[in-house]
From Swiss-Prot:
Subunit of the V1 complex of vacuolar(H+)-ATPase (V-ATPase), a multisubunit enzyme composed of a peripheral complex (V1) that hydrolyzes ATP and a membrane integral complex (V0) that translocates protons. V-ATPase is responsible for acidifying and maintaining the pH of intracellular compartments and in some cell types, is targeted to the plasma membrane, where it is responsible for acidifying the extracellular environment. Subunit H is essential for V-ATPase activity, but not for the assembly of the complex. V-ATPase is a heteromultimeric enzyme made up of two complexes: the ATP-hydrolytic V1 complex and the proton translocation V0 complex. The V1 complex consists of three catalytic AB heterodimers that form a heterohexamer, three peripheral stalks each consisting of EG heterodimers, one central rotor including subunits D and F, and the regulatory subunits C and H. The proton translocation complex V0 consists of the proton transport subunit a, a ring of proteolipid subunits c9c'', rotary subunit d, subunits e and f, and the accessory subunits vah-19/Ac45 and vah-20/PRR. The keyword Transport applies. Gene3D superfamilies: Leucine-rich Repeat Variant, V-type ATPase, subunit H, C-terminal domain. SUPFAM superfamilies: ARM repeat. Keywords: Hydrogen ion transport, Ion transport, Transport. GO terms for molecular function: proton-transporting ATPase activity, rotational mechanism. This is Probable V-type proton ATPase subunit H 1. InterPro entries: ARM-like, ARM-type_fold, ATPase_V1-cplx_hsu, ATPase_V1-cplx_hsu_C, ATPase_V1-cplx_hsu_C_sf.
Length: 451
């Protein structure tokens, strides 16, 4: 099944499949006669199935005690038919959903056997049947969060790796919502957050976010919710800056109309600043937000009347913090010094809208001294990085200075830019092309705000 616009498909697929499993007619006697399961296993499962309510099921479990766990394990491991494994796992998941304190029965038996309670289920995560895999996620999540024994070591890494794989499949995974819901529960605990980010888990979440972009806002909200939970951990917040998380969720912030999605995106961005204890990493988080035009997007959102007090507070916090960074890191003196030394690099000023809006006209001071330096770099520099930044800056000058196009043409900048379109370096060609488009079009805004 491939998902389209109907978000209900991905929200209910697991539940619908579980309903089919619960309605299955079982014949446990067949497996007893062939000695695939013991008589004690048969006695328990039949008695448990006959229990009609929570109280009766609790009584059955208290009577059979450790025999109940042995029976569940034998039914999962000694019967090879997927439909019976599905049925057994569904019984266990329903049992734990009804009362999560029942996780202790697996823990008690595991202690007797000197093994982990999670080891009863770990082998099921590599099964081909995706219902089996995802209901196992559901069971392990309940045990790992509500039980007395927590996932750790190789078992934790294996579980997180399996969840990451589920995310990487995107909407090719009919059960993606189930996996996301498990992560929403697991990521409330620091060790689980750290384990996931240490295996590049963020990449799988951003992939899933892109993959589900046409599946409705609810699944997008849930995936970003997982990101938000991760960013409460300082290490996880730092790791997030090495990928494209900010770029991904900033795109959603600029396009989404749903308040709950906007709220979770803004809160995630705030966490990326507050959870990072290192001053340098805080600055890097702010820089990425500035480069992805978060200040501008927050300014646009101010026009909406949000009812959520926390959202408004988070927006004000971000605006305040980002303005501080802009003021410190995008001074024109810094930019001028960089330009005069001929050492152009991607410092914050180059991609900051506020900087260009306030300072583009200053390239004309002293008979266009600084603008001439930029054009000269296009003609004389052999450094691909310098050429990229110089081309970008000339494009921004044209974009923000009303007569910028004419000024650049008079200095020979247009011809120099066109020559860069034929150089070998693809990055230089890319930035030269963007700048050349701005030079040739009558109104640069026709190109769109994202250029």
């Amino acid at each position: 099944m491939v998902f389209g616009e109907n978000q209900d498909l991905i929200r209910t697929h697991f539940q619908k499949e579980a309903d089919k499993v619960r309605a299955m007619k079982t014949n446990w006697g067949l497996f007893t006669r062939t000695r695939m399961i013991a008589q004690s296993d048969y006695d328990f499962i039949v008695t448990y199935q006959q229990a009609e309510n929570e109280a009766e099921r609790s009584t059955v479990l208290s009577v059979f005690k450790e025999k109940a766990v042995y029976a569940f394990v034998h039914l999962m491991s000694q019967i090879s038919k997927d439909d019976y494994v599905r049925y057994t796992l569904t019984l266990i998941d329903d049992m734990l959903r009804e009362d999560v304190t029942r996780t202790i029965i697996f823990e008690d038996v595991a202690v007797l056997l000197k093994r982990s309670p999670f080891s009863f289920f770990m082998g099921l995560l590599h099964r081909q049947d995706q219902y089996i895999v995802h209901i196992t996620f559901s069971i392990l999540t309940k045990m790992a969060v509500f039980g007395n024994i927590k996932l750790s070591g190789d078992e934790l890494d294996y579980c997180m790796g399996s969840l990451k794989e589920a995310m990487n499949r995107g909407t090719n995974n009919d059960y993606i919502v189930t996996a996301v819901r498990c992560m929403q529960t697991l990521f409330r605990f620091d060790p689980y957050r750290v384990s996931f980010v240490n295996i590049n888990g963020y990449d799988s979440l951003t992939h899933a976010l892109y993959s589900t972009r046409k599946c409705g806002f609810q699944i997008q909200y849930q995936i970003i919710f997982c990101m938000w939970l991760l960013t409460f951990n300082g290490h996880a917040a730092e790791v997030a800056l090495s990928g494209n998380l900010i770029q991904t969720i900033s795109g959603i912030l600029g396009n989404c109309q749903k308040e709950k999605v906007i709220r979770i995106v803004v809160s995630t961005l705030r966490n990326l600043i507050t959870s990072n204890q290192d001053v340098y990493m805080k600055k890097q988080a702010a820089l990425q937000m500035i480069q992805n035009r978060i200040p501008t997007k927050l300014d646009h959102l101010e026009n909406r009347k949000f009812t959520d007090v926390d959202l408004v507070e988070d927006m004000v916090y971000l605006q305040t913090e980002l303005k501080k960074v802009v003021q410190v890191l995008t001074s024109f003196d810094e930019y001028e010094n960089e330009l005069r030394q001929g050492s152009l690099h991607w410092s914050p000023a180059h991609k900051c809208e506020v900087f260009w809006n306030e300072n583009a006209h200053r390239l004309n001071d002293n008979r266009q001294e600084l603008l001439k330096l930029l054009v000269a770099m296009l003609e004389k520099s052999n450094d691909p990085l310098v050429l990229c930044v110089a081309a970008h800056d000339i494009g921004e000058f044209v974009r923000y200075y009303p007569r910028g196009k004419l000024k650049v043409e008079q200095l020979g900048g247009k011809e120099a830019m066109m020559r860069l379109l034929t150089v070998k370096d693809p990055n230089v060609r890319y930035h030269a092309l963007l700048a050349a488009q701005k030079l040739m079009i009558n109104n640069w805004k026709d190109l769109g705000l994202e250029i």
